[in-house]
Amino acid sequence: MTAVQNKEQNTGNEQFRFDYEDTKTVEGRGALRTDSHDLAALRLSRCLQALEGNTGKLLEIGCGAGRYLRSFQHYRPDLELHGCDISHIALEEAENANPNGSIDYKLGDALNLPYDDNRFDVVLLFDVFEHVTDVGKAADEVARVLKPGGVFHCFVPCEGNRKTIFSVLRHSKLIPIHRWKRDHIGHIQILTTRQMQSILERRGLKVTNTTFSFHILGQIHDVFDYWQREVLSRDWVPGWQKLGAKVISKAVFIPTWRLAYYEDTLLKSNRAAIGVHLTCVKRDEPSARQK
């Protein structure tokens, strides 16, 4: 993940502050396997499919502690791996898990990447666009560092999609899922699939494949996860209520994490889905890039 670290972020109607140097918010720990039959494995599998036949230099923007890059070391050892993130703490963890220095990590903001133009054959983002203050600028940077003909693959939680649990709860005061995700994980953009496709296409990134995940079960999983985080963050909530929230959320969280994987492998439609996996190719023609 990446955003403007420790600065106030204007989300449209209020100022919001999120700390990416908090160890509790670091993403990307551990490693992934394609056979673990969960939502993280689904993202990895779809990414690997998107990159079949591509070689050279790969950059992951918003790499966190490096989970996806470590997985690529196993599944795609032929690639030269690079990662950047805005969090010093996340990169410190990534480097600690990179003793031989085979992955090149850099501190960098998605809105101002520390790389030359046309440097990478592949660029990846997982759960990044919803964190940045300017989605178009982040897409500009992707297009800038990606070589013509190169592949861009991303996963975006498009929580503004219609006919989803998130759309039903959009203005809910009882279950304000959008506020919970903003406060606890830094989601400051509520995007839609069409918005993302349009933003990428206008920057010369031709969308060649779009698939979907996080259908109903995945969203139920999310709601209970962030409800628990909200309850546990309140100092005035009694301990017994916090314990109850943990028990209830775990009872939902554990089965839905795996059941959602099977749901997403069966359901191909965009109906009721908020998870969007996009694969693009950078056009060769300089004139293809539109503002």
Task: Describe every region a protein language model picked out.
Residues 144-147:
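Short, cationic motifs built from Arg/Lys/His that form the positively charged side of catalytic pockets
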Residues 68, 130, 159:
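Active-site beta-alpha loop architecture of Rossmann-like, nucleotide-cofactor-dependent enzymes
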